[in-house]
């Protein structure tokens, strides 16, 4: 099962789908609001996306699949696994989002400035201080984005019983190694592997990533399965 990142789509996993579908049953979905999927009618939190994804599992008849999740998809996978240890078998996270580290003084000043300016010139504040991805969102998606990025999932990670592998791109500046290590400290059965690449390490070096994933899931032994 593949769960994509924010402002992304299932097609980002094209090389993984192509590789694994030769030997295993593979499922990749687009979250609501992304990749041509239906738009959100109300702001979704991580829990809302987790509940929606569970409904997709039921509709597709998925039973305890392995999961590969990227960035925002990691948030959803972590939330789901924390709620029910039987949903997944093994979990692979890459570019894992969902950890809020201690904010720097510069960040705090920027936030306070933004809040002050927003009181008098909200549109200017959004243009000046909003992130690149935030600026592209619809009003509903902006409210959803706020809910998502302001939730720290380390508490959920502590509840996960499944084996978890975090594959971290050494050049990832979006979700840096400190966040991966923070997750690792809160996982009961967690392992961290670093590889060359950035936030999209699974695309930067797909073959290495695929081999790491296959070794984690199957120990290098392929089990034939219908597609």
Question: Which sequence ranges carry the predicted segments?
Answer:
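Conserved alpha/beta-hydrolase "acid-adjacent" motif
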Residues: 173-179
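Short beta-strand/loop motif that positions the catalytic acidic residue
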Residues: 159-160, 166-168, 172
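Conserved alpha/beta-hydrolase catalytic His-Asp/Glu region
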Residues: 101-162
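Conserved HGGG/HGGXW glycine-rich cap/lid loop of the alpha/beta-hydrolase fold
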Residues: 1-36
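Flexible "cap/lid" loop of the alpha/beta hydrolase fold
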Residues: 75-83, 88-120
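Catalytic histidine-centered segment of alpha/beta-hydrolase-like enzymes
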Residues: 198-211
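Active-site loop/oxyanion-hole signature of alpha/beta-hydrolase fold enzymes
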Residues: 14, 27-68, 211
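Catalytic histidine neighborhood in serine/cysteine hydrolases
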Residues: 184-200
């Amino acid at each position: 099962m593949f769960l994509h990142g924010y402002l992304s789509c299932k097609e980002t996993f094209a090389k993984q789908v192509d590789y694994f579908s030769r030997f295993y049953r593979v499922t990749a979905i687009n979250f609501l609001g992304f990749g041509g999927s239906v738009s959100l009618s109300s702001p979704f939190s991580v829990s809302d996306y987790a509940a929606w994804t569970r409904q997709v599992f039921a509709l597709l008849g998925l039973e305890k699949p392995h999961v590969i999740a990227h960035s925002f998809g990691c948030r959803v996978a972590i939330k789901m696994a924390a709620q029910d240890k039987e949903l997944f078998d093994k979990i692979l996270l890459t570019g894992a989002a969902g950890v809020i580290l201690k904010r720097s003084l510069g960040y705090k000043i920027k936030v306070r400035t933004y809040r002050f300016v927003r009181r008098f010139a909200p549109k200017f504040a959004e243009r000046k201080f909003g992130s690149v991805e935030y600026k592209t969102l619809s009003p509903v998606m902006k409210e959803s984005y706020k809910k998502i990025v302001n939730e720290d999932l380390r508490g959920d990670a502590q509840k996960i019983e499944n084996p978890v592998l975090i594959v971290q791109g050494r050049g990832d500046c979006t979700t840096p190694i400190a966040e991966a290590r923070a997750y690792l400290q809160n996982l009961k059965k967690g392992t961290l592997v670093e590889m060359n690449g950035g936030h999209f390490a699974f695309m930067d070096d797909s073959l290495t990533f695929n081999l790491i994933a296959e070794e984690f899931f199957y120990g290098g032994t392929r089990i034939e399965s219908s597609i």
